[in-house]
Amino acid sequence: MGLLTKGSPLTWAETVPHIDYIKKHGIAQFINLYHRLKSRHGDQLKWGDEIEYTIVKFDDANKKVRVSCKAEELLNKLQAEEQVNAMLGTANRFLWRPEFGSYMIEGTPGMPYGGLIACFNIVEANMKLRRQVVKKLLKKDETCLSISFPSLGVPGFTFPEVAADRKNDDAANSVFWPEQAVFLGHPRFKNLTKNIKGRRGSKVAINVPIFKDTNTPSPFVEDLSALGGPDDTRDAKPDHIYMDHMGFGMGCCCLQVTFQAVNVDEARWLYDQLTPITPILLALSAATPIFRGKLSNVDSRWDIISASVDDRTPEERGLEPLKNSKWVIDKSRYDSTDCYIYPCSVGYNDIPLQYDETIYKQLIDGNIDEPLAKHIAHMFIRDPHQVFRERIEQDDEKSSEHFETIQSSNWMNMRFKPPPPDAPEIGWRVEFRPTEVQLTDFENAAYCCFVVLLTRMMISFRLTYLMPISMVTENMKRAQQKDAVLNQKFLFRKGLAECKSAPENLKGSEKCGPPSQDIEEMSIDEIINGKKNGFPGLISLIRQFLDSADVDVDTRCTISQYLNFISKRATGEINTLAHWTRGFVQSHPAYKHDSDVNDNIVYDLLKKMDAISNGEDHCEKLLGCYRSKTDHAISAAVRKAEEHMIVSSQKRAH
């Protein structure tokens, strides 16, 4: 979602004179915040998920489905309960926020989940209730799906139907995407679209490889002449699905998990340890094979979002000699991270890092250590796109808005999140960002709990998963390929090694040994389930952690169901949503094996998806035979026992 500041947003031309000021003061804000809170210690594990939903409307008479652009109307109703609860002092069950599309909403639990193992048993129940609450506000021909809509940009894909206007600068001159498909209830989203185009010097160009079926033309070249002149579609490539608007990426739905660390050192350590895991979860959660009504040759939204917000100038993309720009920048501002940030991980930073020398010096002079200073200075090679006229001058001791406007628009696979200055209850956090959103609440809960259990296992066993950061970049590319779970190999640590420089051991760089070369290519199955006489598998390590914990019967059952499900998906016995979707399309009687996924197919696909997500139709190919024992509440006895255990362990730690 990003930073939702109130005010009057500046255009790109209006922003440019303020860029250096905003960067300088953004860094000052970070330095002040860091030193004020760097000694904060003892925060409990709290965590939460963010799920984005698409609202769709079925036209049964014509067998067509469209996105329903009513997010603002829904949010007004959903957020009214939050306002009432605030007045009454009542806890919220969930929170609702806008997303990029006018057909999208984002839901989170009303309060973070706590450190109790029993909390894993209430996650799915909360997700189910969220979906039910939204559906009660919809009409009979509408539904709420946790998917990326496959026909974005197809003529008439919105309800109400609005045509794209290539002459409309507010819609970034797209030939596919109407302004009304962007959420207009907050200026952030439209302004981001315009300012990315303004900085880049042209509209974004997204080209996704087409899936070559038996009847797909070769080369595949679309006739887009009816949509505009040659200049309007000049960036289209043969054998690719062409798109030209931020909405094709940011209009996809995602699943993210944020968790709080005990202190800043643990947050930085977890950021690094989880980074090599991100491509594995991207492949394991693959869910997005269709773009603009065409079957693509990739299974993930990741590179599509990356291209949709790529604001680099031609010089920064290496297309023209450097003249007005400072650097050639290898990646979009939405991509995988280029550096580890924990002091003893720096030996694995093998990618040349572009960073702002002036910003870096300001950070070093402000007593920020080198690894963190380089990470922040690297983020600050990007310019701010969200500047509000009323918020240019700020108190750098009390605000972090200038820092966050750049930090929150560096969309990487991991995000290191300092505490907000105005929320003393929130500590140092890490956000895990690559996972594709799943069709059902069971799947989404399984992935969220799996990631959080990974963090608990990592902290408990202090094993290291680090590899050269360039290998993570390579793995992210492999993870998006069609059927990556079945066909790709991923670079990964082949043996277990204890991290000698874990936060509680770190006294200085003397603990940091040379980078390990103990890396080999493994399948997703081998990484998740283990390899004979080799890596034991992430699930095996999680089970060992759980064996040392006191877990109630229902929670243990639920966690076991989630882990068994993840295990079977890793083997390929259970399909990824992307694989299942391809199979549905290719076996549909209306499919002509030409890569075109027409209205009739999409209608039947989403009808089937709705039935599965509602529990009306159980699909074993997609879900297996697993059921959790999720509940809305933790029993008082279990809560009391686990809280006593946590207090006892904290006393032993001190």
Swiss-Prot record:
Similarity field: Belongs to the glutamate--cysteine ligase type 3 family.
Reactions this protein catalyses: L-cysteine + L-glutamate + ATP = gamma-L-glutamyl-L-cysteine + ADP + phosphate + H(+)
Signal peptide: none
Induction: By oxidative stress such as arsenite treatment.
SUPFAM superfamilies: Glutamine synthetase/guanido kinase
GO molecular function: ATP binding; glutamate-cysteine ligase activity
Annotated knockout phenotype: RNAi-mediated knockdown of gsr-1 in mutants lacking trxr-1 causes an arrest during larval molting characterized by a partial detachment of the old cuticle and an impaired ability to reduce cuticle components. Also results in growth arrest during the postdauer molt. RNAi-mediated knockdown causes a severe loss of viability upon arsenite treatment.
Name of the protein in question: Glutamate--cysteine ligase
